């Protein structure tokens, strides 16, 4: 599982559209869909129901969404803390 897969998944769930998520994340829709399919394969579950009207989270997808949002928030916070640390404690040779 990769962070980018979780980003695509969360944005797709928020927008209910793979193509809109791809635009928001400055990627291509085929890459977005492939990342979601890989995530579904890895988790051995279907995360979205797909129809001509768009996409909807499955019950399993709703569970994954809650955890994915939390994971991404924690990654963002970790990066913020590390950046603060670099500013106050620069690495010296």
Segment roles from a protein language model:
Residues 8-12, 64:
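Short alpha-helical "packing" element that flanks the helix-turn-helix/winged-helix DNA-binding module
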Residues 40-57:
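A short LG(V/I)-centered, amphipathic sequence patch enriched
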Residues 12-28:
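Short helix-boundary/capping micro-motifs
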């Amino acid at each position: 599982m990769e962070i980018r897969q979780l980003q695509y998944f969360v944005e797709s769930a928020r927008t209910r559209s793979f193509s809109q998520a791809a635009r928001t994340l400055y990627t291509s829709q085929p890459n977005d869909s492939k990342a979601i399919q890989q995530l579904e394969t890895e988790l051995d579950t279907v995360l979205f129901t797909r129809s001509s009207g768009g996409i909807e989270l499955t019950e399993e997808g709703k569970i994954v969404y809650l955890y994915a949002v939390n994971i991404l928030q924690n990654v963002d916070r970790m990066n913020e803390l590390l950046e603060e640390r670099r500013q106050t404690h620069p690495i010296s040779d």
